[in-house]
């Protein structure tokens, strides 16, 4: 509800294990009742207005519909003037019920059985969006399992998921939530210095085998994550940045020499290259499976046609790369922030105390 829910990483859907759902919802209602919805100039205000009248109508209509369907769990009174929306909690079956993002102080709650956890993760990943994800648990095995499976750029464990700190928590999503590089991450500045593509002497004169190419793309699996890097942060908090290869990067030349250079560049960066052996009609790129990116160093008109075909794809955003690729083009970045105090303390710090 902070910033009236108008932050990209604000919690939109909360999954609660059904064993504790009744108690948690009771506590949530009590906390909401303490919130003050009022003029943001006042120090006592917790929740201010939403950005404009159009946003107000969209959010208000969503809450009204939920109330009519008997799914409104709790809300507060709003000021009678202005574009204020009081915090609201709405019951849903799962994140699939949310056909669009409600960018305001609205929390959707779904419950799940303990043995349905894998199903919950699959539901979240199936949306295609992956900016921030939060997890609260004292079970270390559960943390490891979920962190390995969830497809989100920033993961927060046992702490809130708002307010990435520059230098400690590089910020950015994946899938439909971003193509990288992460803001404040190790690949951010290099993106501004990417070298131009090599000049092309001779383009392909034969057509590529689309059937064979499709088979190759389907066979490429997601790689395991690389060793994480520890980032600085306050005592009691762990911040780790890691990378893993994206899906296949299609290297389209437009010549044999250019394709070989593209494959070599992607390989050197730790990515998964797939080179072609002839020309491809750009329209085919709209349906080729598993594409994470396309490299093209040829003419501008063909480049525009490729870009149009990629924009017609469903699922994650597929980038067109017209320069030499950089690490962010071929690698997913993940950041995991853990409040170690919530799980018994900072093991590294305790070990140092033992040496004193």
Regions found by a protein language model. Give the residues of each.
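Conserved C-terminal structural/oligomerization subdomain of aldehyde/semialdehyde dehydrogenase
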Residues: 2, 19, 26-37, 48, ...
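Extended low-complexity, polyampholyte segments enriched in Ser/Thr/Pro and acidic residues
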Residues: 6-8
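Short linear capping/connector segments at secondary-structure termini
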Residues: 42-47
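Short beta-strand to alpha-helix junction loop
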Residues: 50-59
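Glycine-centered, phosphate/nucleic-acid-interacting loop/turn motifs that mediate DNA/RNA or nucleotide
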Residues: 70
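Diglycine-centered glycine-rich loop/turn motifs
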Residues: 73-77
């Amino acid at each position: 509800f902070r910033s009236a829910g108008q932050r990209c990483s604000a919690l939109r859907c909360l999954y609660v294990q059904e064993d504790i759902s009744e108690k948690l919802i009771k506590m949530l209602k009590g906390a909401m009742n303490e919130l003050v919805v009022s003029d943001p100039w006042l120090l006592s205000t917790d929740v201010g207005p939403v950005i404009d009248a159009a946003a107000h109508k969209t959010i208000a209509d969503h809450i009204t519909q939920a109330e009519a369907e008997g799914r409104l769990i709790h809300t507060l009174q709003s000021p009678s003037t202005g574009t204020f929306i009081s915090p609201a909690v709405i019951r849903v079956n799962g994140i699939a019920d949310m056909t669009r993002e409600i960018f305001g102080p609205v929390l959707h709650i779904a419950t799940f059985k303990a043995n349905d956890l894998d199903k919950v993760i699959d539901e979240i990943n199936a949306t295609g969006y992956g900016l921030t994800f939060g997890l609260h648990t004292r079970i270390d095995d559960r943390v490891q399992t979920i962190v390995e499976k969830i497809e989100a750029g920033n993961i927060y464990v046992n702490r809130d998921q708002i307010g990435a700190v520059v230098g400690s928590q590089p910020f950015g999503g994946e899938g439909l939530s971003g193509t990288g590089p992460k803001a404040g991450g190790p690949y951010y500045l290099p993106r501004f210095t990417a070298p131009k593509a090599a000049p092309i002497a001779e383009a392909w004169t034969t057509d590529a085998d689309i059937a064979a190419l499709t088979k190759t793309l389907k066979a490429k699996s997601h790689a395991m994550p690389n060793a994480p890097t520890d980032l600085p942060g306050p005592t009691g908090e762990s911040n780790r940045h890691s990378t893993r290869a994206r899906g296949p990067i299609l290297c389209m030349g437009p010549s044999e020499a250019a394709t070989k250079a593209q494959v070599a560049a992607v390989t050197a960066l730790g990515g998964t290259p797939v080179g072609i052996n002839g020309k491809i009609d750009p329209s085919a790129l709209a349906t080729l499976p598993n594409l994470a990116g396309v490299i093209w160093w040829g003419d501008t008109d063909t480049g525009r046609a490729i870009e149009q075909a990629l924009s017609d794809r469903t699922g994650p955003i597929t980038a067109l790369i017209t320069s030499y690729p950089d690490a962010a083009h071929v690698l997913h970045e993940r950041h995991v922030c853990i409040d170690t105090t919530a799980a018994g303390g900072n093991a590294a710090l305790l070990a140092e105390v033992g040496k004193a």
